[in-house]
């Protein structure tokens, strides 16, 4: 399974105006045998009590006005509401929820982010965790929205590109939404394990370096991600 981001799709930070986007879509879908959804590049799949929602943050991107587009956002809302998975991983190329971001981020679309958040609250959808990349470093972000269980965004990258450190003068250097000791500006990848009794499931997030050594671990319990009535 795979999704794309800007460098798989086009040039750096490319959006929906990229003139070769249909060529990119055709090549990507020929290379990756993903489940298709109306010939577009987003889909969902489930393994046991875990479901993944794989998003396209490029094809309909309008530089922070929209990232997903109405059609994909409506699809995501419908699929989330229909899911009975204990953990629901929303996977997106760019970071999802970083209020301090100086780069591309779904949170900065404002309207799409708020629309999705309001829907999650209204439908009392449990178990959502975001998985993202793009930033050339790793970190785990935690955002507490009003009336909502904590939202996590587990960002990893790079695996093959060069790492980039956040400068000390950058407002993200001391990001208050970053969980302590999770920032890692070197080659990395993640491992996710879901274990435990079905009524008391636990999700273990692990960050590893390029040799496979664990850099840090963080556990999230099913009961930590229950929507409030």
Residue ranges of predicted features:
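Metal-dependent phosphoester/phosphodiester hydrolase catalytic core
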Residues: 1-229
């Amino acid at each position: 399974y795979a999704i794309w981001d800007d460098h798989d799709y086009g040039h750096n930070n490319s959006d929906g105006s990229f003139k070769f986007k249909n060529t990119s879509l055709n090549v990507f879908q020929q290379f990756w045998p993903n489940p298709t959804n109306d010939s577009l590049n987003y889909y969902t799949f489930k393994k046991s009590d875990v479901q993944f929602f794989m998003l396209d943050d490029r094809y309909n991107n309008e530089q922070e006005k929209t990232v997903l587009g109405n059609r994909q956002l409506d699809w995501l809302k419908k699929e989330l509401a229909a899911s009975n998975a204990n953990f629901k991983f929303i996977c997106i190329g760019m970071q999802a929820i970083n209020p301090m971001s100086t780069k591309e981020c779904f949170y900065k679309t404002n309207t799409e982010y708020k629309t999705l958040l309001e829907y999650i609250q209204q439908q009392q959808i449990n178990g959502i965790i975001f998985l993202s990349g793009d930033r050339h470093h790793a970190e785990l972000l935690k955002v507490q929205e009003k009336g909502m269980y904590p939202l996590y965004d587990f960002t990893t990258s790079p695996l093959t590109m060069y790492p980039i450190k956040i400068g000390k003068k950058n407002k993200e250097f001391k990001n208050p939404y970053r969980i302590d000791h999770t920032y890692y500006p070197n080659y990395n990848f993640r491992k996710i394990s879901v274990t435990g009794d079905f009524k008391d499931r636990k999700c273990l997030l692990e960050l590893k370096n390029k040799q496979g050594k664990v850099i840090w671990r963080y556990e999230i319990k099913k009961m930590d991600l229950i929507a409030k009535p």
